[in-house]
Every structure is written in structure tokens, then in C-alpha cells.
Amino acid sequence: SGIRETVRAGREEMRNTLLSWLPEDLSGRQVLDAGCGTGVISIELAKRGAEVIAVDLSQSLIELANERYSTMDEYHRIQFIVGDMRQLEGERFDHVLAMDSIIHYVAQDGLRTLETLADSVDESMVFTFAPKTLPLAAMHAVGKFFPRSDRAPAIEPIAPAVLLRSLDQSSELTDWTVGREHRVSTGFYTSQAMELVREC
């Protein structure tokens, strides 16, 4: 449908934005694709040379990712895992990418997730959140009237200023600073990217 087309275009623009914030050459780097879905970003990271841990709560999406990419040369660099991004104990990463996954947590849980991930990350975290705006609130309300197949999973919008204040006040993120930000808004897809960079 037309709705799905605008969502697909928006997601593609957001995916390209987040990927552009990571180094072109990721050889020897460990990257977490948090909430990897069907692994579209994971395979792009692997093509850049990264060793990727790709985690998602959905077993069916992980199975689909394994089926889709098992014949590709880069597949051996990706470890697809069914599980919670907050419970990867003992792993260390150079970068974390979380596209449209933290947006499903309420604000406090989203912040706690970033704090938990930050403990195991050496360089940067790039992620998206649903910005609390009047147009998004209106779309959210209107969206409830669409057929279930056209509806997006539940999201938890947060005002950018509130998120920035929460990040600034977090005792767990004192070594991190906010880098780039970018909002994508195409029809029924609205999401905002943010970069957190660990200070040297």
C-alpha cells in the first residue's frame, strides 16, 4: 500500500543515515546490531569488514535472516542471536547500531537500555527514537483506524529535549557526548537518529 511505501522509503533513508555515521572500513571492529530484524544492516556492516553480533527478540526474524544470508560471503562474520540486547554479558563492542528498536521502550527503559549498552561499548552508539511531535501524535491516533496489516508496532514517542536532558543527567553516561542528530519524516514514518560518542 501507499502507507507501506512511505514507511519503506523512510526506513531506507534512516538506515543509510546510521550507516554513514560509522566508519567505511570496519575491519577488525566488533559491532552490535541491536534489534537487527531480518539483518539488512548486519550484512552491510559485514561487507565493511565488521564482526557483527546481530540480536533480535523475534525468533522468526532471526531464522529469516539466517536463511536469507547463509550463502553470502560475509555471512561468516555475523552471529545472529535470538535474545535481548540488554543481556549480552561479557561482550565488548566498538560500535552499537540500534535502528527503530529502542523506540518500543518507554522513556526510562530506553534510557536504561542505553546505559546498559554503554558499559560494553568503546567508541559510539547510533540509535533512533520516535520524536514527540504534534504531527507524529496525530499520525499515531489516525493509525489506530487502519487495518492491522498497515499498522506499525507500538512506539513510545519522547520529546528530543527530554531525551537530551535525560542523557545529560545520567550518572552512567558521563563519559558520553551527543554527536550528530538527524530526523527522517516521510509520510507515515517519523524517526530521529542520534549519535552518542565516548569521550577519550
What would you call each of these model-derived segments?
Residues 1-25:
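Conserved class I S-adenosyl-L-methionine
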Residues 35-37:
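Class I SAM-dependent methyltransferase "Motif I" SAM/SAH-binding loop
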Residues 40-84:
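Class I SAM-dependent methyltransferase SAM/SAH-binding core
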Residues 97:
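A conserved beta-strand element that flanks and buttresses the S-adenosyl-L-methionine
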Residues 105-116:
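A short, conserved alpha-helix within the catalytic core of class I
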Residues 122-130:
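Conserved beta-strand signature within the Rossmann-like core of class I S-adenosyl-L-methionine
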Residues 136-153:
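Short, glycine-/aromatic-enriched active-site segment of Class I SAM-dependent methyltransferases
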Residues 154-172:
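Short alpha-helix
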